[in-house]
């Protein structure tokens, strides 16, 4: 089956719009003068009449670009609560207190991206700006550990934070990794809530790379 071009689809949509207008004219729902009046409006006048289209708010800027950051295939058994060799500077006790110390699924090799926060925002705004299906932006705890081992140079330095979204059962959490003088440290936060993270210190966000 031949795929329609963008021009063909646009022409088809435009033809459908014309047919709809003619049908409404014929049925007396609108007048020719009304159609002519609307068609002669400027772009600004139409926006004032119908309301502006909502602008997409950008919270994140891609840093890794063309870099290939590939996580290993993993069995999913490793958790952050027990990863002392990777996080010698400290592991938040809430990983255990909140019941996150659970194995996950096995994963194949996975490419990831590193983003930088460029607009103050909550976790919901950060990750939601990438797409509404949050499951797509989750890494397993084993993958988060693997990233920190393989690519420590991509973590935000100077004690500032890098965020990783993960899921345990039906609950979303955010692992927060910091590079400290004594090595890496990690704590955990809930995904919800209204805490706004400042973009002035340029926190980073690591997510799975999506196949186009």
Predicted regions and their residues:
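A binding-site-centric feature that preferentially detects glycan-recognition modules on secreted/surface proteins
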Residues: 1-137, 142-212
């Amino acid at each position: 089956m031949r795929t329609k071009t963008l021009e063909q689809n646009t022409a088809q949509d435009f033809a459908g719009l014309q047919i709809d207008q003619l049908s409404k004219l014929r049925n007396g729902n609108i007048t020719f003068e009304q159609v002519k009046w609307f068609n002669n409006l400027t772009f600004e006048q139409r926006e004032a009449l119908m309301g502006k289209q909502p602008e997409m708010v950008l919270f994140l800027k891609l840093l890794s670009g063309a870099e290939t950051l590939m996580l290993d295939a993993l069995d999913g058994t490793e958790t952050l609560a027990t990863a002392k060799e990777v996080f010698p500077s400290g592991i938040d006790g809430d990983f255990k207190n909140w019941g996150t110390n659970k194995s996950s699924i096995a994963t194949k090799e996975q490419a990831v991206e590193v983003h930088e926060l460029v607009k103050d925002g909550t976790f919901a705004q950060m990750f939601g700006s990438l797409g509404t299906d949050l499951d797509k932006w989750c890494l397993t705890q084993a993958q988060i550990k693997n990233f920190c081992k393989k690519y420590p140079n991509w973590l935000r330095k100077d004690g500032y934070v890098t965020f990783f979204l993960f899921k345990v059962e039906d609950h979303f959490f955010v692992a927060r990794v910091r590079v400290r003088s004594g090595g890496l440290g990690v704590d955990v936060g809930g995904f919800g809530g209204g805490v706004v993270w400042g973009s002035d210190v340029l926190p980073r966000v690591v997510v799975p790379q999506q196949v186009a």
